[in-house]
Curated annotation (Swiss-Prot):
Protein name per UniProt: Ulvan lyase, long isoform
Amino-acid positions noted as binding Ca(2+) 2 in the UniProt annotation, renumbered to this chain: 300, 303, 305
Family recorded in the similarity comment: Belongs to the polysaccharide lyase 24 family.
Gene Ontology BP annotations: polysaccharide catabolic process
Keywords of this entry: Calcium, Lyase, Metal-binding, Signal
Species, as recorded: Alteromonas sp
Alphabetical list of SUPFAM superfamilies matching this protein: Type I dockerin domain
Signal peptide coordinates: 1-21
Pfam families, alphabetized: BNR_4
């Protein structure tokens, strides 16, 4: 089935649907050549910290930010459009106004630039769209822009006092002349949190900073205008699986917005709901009412849905939505909503066969609308989560409830669409095929789409967004070129509603009927007439489920009359009628009447016929059941009865995973009773029961009951049994179980490995705790913490220029980090890592000389040292030399040398003895380290080391010479270059006592 990227739209046709309207392109206008577009890589958390720093503009989520979101609106004969300015270094918020009468284009450039993903301007953020509105009461322009659930504290406080961005103009600015349509018509922020003299962004819409908490953590702005001209704004509060829709109101007379009011509560679990949930859909003001339609994303990760499930719809009978909310049946709901089941319409996940956890995926291609006469249309898509599985399934669904009908018609005969807009009674699909616009239309309350327009030339477009007003489509488009600045266009497409007014008026007696299977009679008198004088109805054709029944060319247009009893699916009611061999079976059937007038114009009406089944009604005690592996007892009392008086139940058969267990032919239809304990997979529970040799093991089982009545008609019911085995939680692994760093460390980024040991289970989240306190929950692999957008998670200081120093770094000590992984069944596994933070060591110091031994009267002594620090951010302040704890000299820069040039005598004249030389190094953290050596000074001539020079030393001297021993050159007293007997006299002259000399 070919799938097109489409939009679904509706507009008025005065009660009839014409197939002959001439939809035309009325105008095409180039708005700019410089619309911002993200042309780089689609990043994730594993690489978002290293975006392209060149020309390419990398992005997170999606590449579109201009001609995206709530970006085009009309006011009188003007069309207003918002966009961001390309390229990468521009990014300004822009507002353009096109005058459809004069062709004049005016553009205002705002100082604010797109801040990028979580505050990084190098990474584009497609969710940060610009919402736009013009008050029809006072001509003020309102813009809310460039935000994604920001508050004062998240993302390192980057958005403090700037997490909500609202700009507005003075009254009447919307229709000022071209020369006066300028930036100064917008109101500056002069509050205490103003970002400067050119700040046109306001932190609240009320003007009161005391309300700022009401404007935090919001995303996706969209404005609406009520029937009396009041502006409403709705946004999403919170996150994907715990969020709420909130809305506020503009009082044009007071020129003031209210605070936001919730449609539903978030944190629903704390208010009694079994789980938290978020909304994926829209709030819209359509047909005079505020309405909501969405799919639910719950925090329950054990069901078969990967993300969203269900279709939910509600509307308010209050003119501004402040109360009186109801479901599609008109039944009151709790407001604010807590339990979403109060407004559930149906479950798209039932339209594919998968039942395993997280196997069903219904993200995207969802939207809804309501026509002017009250037809509700909802589109959705469901597919297998795993696109590679051999039994892959994908279904597009168009569910619609014609005005006056009680229930929805669910059709899978639908090619798909992405968004819906409404204005009247027709449904339109507007989209791009081959990059060029096309339009298809169907009458509201039907699924009969016909293509009525296709562009064949002109620019090829990449994407667009649209707004419909008074029968015209304002299609705001980005041309498909290249780079991060691409052209933007406005196309105005006329839907030709005037010709639709000439279409015939055709209707069934009722929009819906309900009959019992085997109904005898259904006669339908179809009303058809032309609203144009002089025209007449040429024919009326009846179709059932899109198959032609008959064409009638004369009044009355009666189908199913006495001569043709079977044509409406009835059995026949007269004695002359043979039983219908092909009566309409149980189910929902669409009757369609096509009226054609004398000018060839045609119109369609539809009716829903519900045929109630005569088959037995059969059910299990409950739809699903969980037991532990090895369960002893499972008794199932299956209910079965006939819907038709006089019939009886002949048998009920039980199947497990398609295999017959047993057929029971008498009440009660009880399986797994005491006489047959094993047939439902149980072990047995009485002393008389032997152990089941083939019990049901861990897994999911489909139980099916087939009931057959006395006429041979059968019905089935099913129950899912989950047999739980021993828990197999995810395995969590750190790269290293212990990491050691020094105090003040700049960077610590760690990727955690988490996987389930069970095939088919996915890791839904990894949560990091530091010393028992929550750090962050990551819901998208790779499970990377401490990356450049979260540099402080492991207590580091930060390492990029844009990182402010961590105000709370981890101190010296041992810290425990715990990673908790949760899988798609809700099981959790965890693992710890120990982080040891050491004090920064003092400097390393080395004295280059070993211990020194010298003789008195030595002429030189030098000591040198080298020192280094623990890291490059620390410097050496000084090295100081101490001799015997007395400072010699402190040196503040290398070379570190004492006794060298310019200081040659500072180490001379040391007395006899051993001296401690100590060098103390001091670094810029005031840490000190020391190294030491010994300097020994001996008395010259005291060869026997008795502290005097005497005859004993002279004898030792002469004996050494006789023995040829090498002597210190200092004993060359006569300076002839050798030490010999001639130096004995010199030694004698050094005798301590004069007597030695005379001797």
């Amino acid at each position: 089935m070919k799938c097109l990227k489409t939009l679904l739209v509706s507009t008025t046709l005065l009660g009839a649907f014409s197939l002959n309207a001439e939809v035309t392109l009325e105008q095409q206008i180039k708005i700019t050549d410089e619309g911002l577009h993200f042309d780089g890589r689609n990043l994730d958390f594993s690489n978002v910290g290293s975006p392209d720093t060149g020309e390419k503009y990398d992005y997170f989520f999606g590449p579109n930010i201009s001609a995206h979101g709530d970006a085009v609106k009309t006011y009188k004969h003007y069309v207003f459009m918002t966009w961001y300015k390309g390229g990468k270094n521009e990014r300004n918020v822009m507002l353009s106004r096109y005058n459809t009468l004069s062709g004049e284009l005016s553009t205002i450039e705002f100082p604010h630039r797109h801040t990028g993903f979580r505050g990084d301007p190098l990474v584009g953020e497609s969710h940060n769209t610009i919402g736009l509105a013009v008050s029809p009461i006072n001509g003020t322009i309102h813009m809310v822009f460039d935000m994604h659930a920001y508050d004062d504290n998240n993302h390192g406080g980057k958005f403090k006092d700037d997490f909500f961005r609202y700009s507005y103009s003075v009254p009447g600015a919307a229709e000022l002349p071209h020369s006066e349509f300028t930036l100064d018509k917008f109101v500056k922020d002069t509050s205490e949190v103003s970002q400067g003299d050119d700040d046109y962004k306001h932190l609240t819409m009320t003007g009161d900073l005391g309300d700022k908490g009401n404007f935090a953590r919001l995303t996706y702005p969209k404005f609406f205008t009520t029937v009396d001209g009041t502006l409403l704004l709705y946004m999403r509060l919170g996150g994907n699986n715990n969020g709420a829709y909130v809305f506020n109101r503009y009082d044009a007379e007071a020129e003031k917005w209210s605070t936001f009011t919730p449609f539903n509560e978030n944190n629903q679990k704390s208010k009694g709901n079994p789980y938290n949930w978020g909304l994926y859909g829209n709030m819209k003001y359509i047909n005079g009412k505020l309405r909501v339609g969405f799919q639910q994303r719950s925090s329950d990760n054990t069901d078969k849905y990967k993300y969203q499930n269900g279709v939910f719809y509600a509307y308010s009978d209050h003119p501004d939505g402040f109360g009186d909310w109801k479901n599609h049946k008109g039944e009151p709901m709790t407001w604010p909503l807590i339990n979403s089941d109060e407004i559930k319409v149906f479950e798209p996940g039932d339209y594919i066969s998968h039942t395993e956890a997280n196997s069903v995926y219904i993200v995207g291609s969802f939207d809804w609308t309501v026509t002017e006469k009250g037809d509700i249309h909802i589109i959705s898509k469901v597919r297998s989560t795993d696109r590679n599985r051999p039994d892959y399934e994908e279904v597009y669904i168009h569910s619609y409830k014609p005005a006056g009908a009680d229930e929805f018609i669910i059709s899978t005969d639908f090619t798909g669409a992405s968004e819906i807009y409404t204005s009247g009674d027709n449904v339109y699909i507007v989209g791009l095929e081959g990059g060029r616009p096309y339009v298809e239309k169907a009458q509201g309350g039907t699924n009969n789409f016909v293509r009525v327009y296709k562009a064949t030339d002109g620019p090829v477009f990449d994407h667009g967004t649209l707004y419909i007003k008074d029968g015209k489509v304002y299609y705001y488009l980005m041309e498909r070129t290249s780079g991060n600045a691409m052209p933007l266009y406005l196309q105005i497409i006329d839907l030709d509603l005037e010709s639709d007014a000439n279409a015939p008026l055709v209707s069934f007696p009722s929009p819906s009927l309900t009959v019992e299977q085997g109904f005898e009679k259904l006669s339908l008198n179809i009303s058809a007439e032309s609203p144009v004088e002089g025209r007449f109805i040429q024919s009326v054709s009846l179709y059932i489920n899109d198959e032609l029944v008959r064409t009638d060319d004369s009044m009355p247009y009666l189908f199913g009359h006495g001569s043709k009893p079977h044509e409406t699916g009835a059995m026949g009611w007269l004695d002359t009628h043979e039983p219908n061999p092909s009566p309409l079976p149980a189910g929902t059937h669409i009757f369609k009447a096509v009226a054609v007038d004398s000018e060839g114009d045609s119109a369609i009406a539809t009716m829903v016929l519900n045929v109630n089944s005569n088959a037995p009604i059969v059910s299990f005690p409950q739809e699903s059941l969980e037991v532990d592996e090895g369960f002893e007892k499972l008794s199932l009392n299956i209910s079965a009865e006939s819907a038709v008086e006089g019939r009886s139940i002949e048998s009920v058969s039980l199947y497990i995973n398609g295999e017959l267990v047993r057929t029971d032919t008498s009440l009660p239809y009880l399986f797994g009773h005491a006489s047959k304990p094993h047939e439902t997979g149980a072990m047995g529970w009485l002393d008389t029961h032997s152990t089941n040799p083939s019990p049901l093991t861990a897994g999911t089982y489909e139980f099916t009951a087939v009931a057959i009545d006395s006429e041979g008609e059968e019905s089935t019911a099913s129950m899912q049994l989950v047999v739980k085995g021993e828990p197999q939680p995810p395995a969590v692994t750190w790269p290293n179980s212990t990491v050691t760093v020094y105090e003040g460390y700049e960077k610590l980024a760690i990727t955690i490995d988490a996987e389930s040991p069970v095939e088919g289970r996915d890791i839904q989240s990894v949560t990091l705790y530091r010393n028992g306190e929550l750090v962050r929950v990551d819901t998208r692999p790779v499970w990377n913490f401490g990356h450049s957008f979260a540099p402080y998670e492991f207590g580091a200081m930060g390492w990029l220029d844009r990182h402010e120093p961590n105000p709370s770094p981890l101190g010296v000590g041992t810290h425990t980090f715990t990673a908790v992984a949760k899988d798609s069944t809700g099981l959790e596994g965890e693992s710890d890592m120990t982080l040891i933070v050491l004090s920064l060591p003092g400097p390393s110091i080395t004295i280059n000389e070993s211990d020194v031994s010298l003789l008195t009267e030595y002429q030189n002594l030098a000591i040198t040292a080298d020192a280094s620090t623990a890291n490059d951010d620390i410097t050496i302040v000084s090295l100081a030399l101490y001799l015997n704890e007395q400072l010699v000299r402190e040196i503040y820069e290398p070379p570190f040398e004492w006794g060298g040039e310019n200081y040659s005598d500072e180490l001379l004249d040391l007395p006899v003895g051993t001296h401690l030389a100590k060098v103390v190094a001091t670094d810029s953290n005031n840490n000190q380290t020391e190294a030491s050596m010994f300097v020994t000074i001996e008395l010259l001539g005291d060869l026997n080391k008795d502290s005097v020079v005497d005859n004993k030393d002279i004898r030792l001297f002469t004996a050494a010479l006789r023995n040829g021993e090498e002597m210190n050159i200092r004993y060359d007293f006569n300076d002839d270059g050798v030490v010999n007997n001639r130096d004995t006299r010199g030694l004698v002259h050094r005798c301590t006592y004069s007597r030695c000399g005379s001797n």
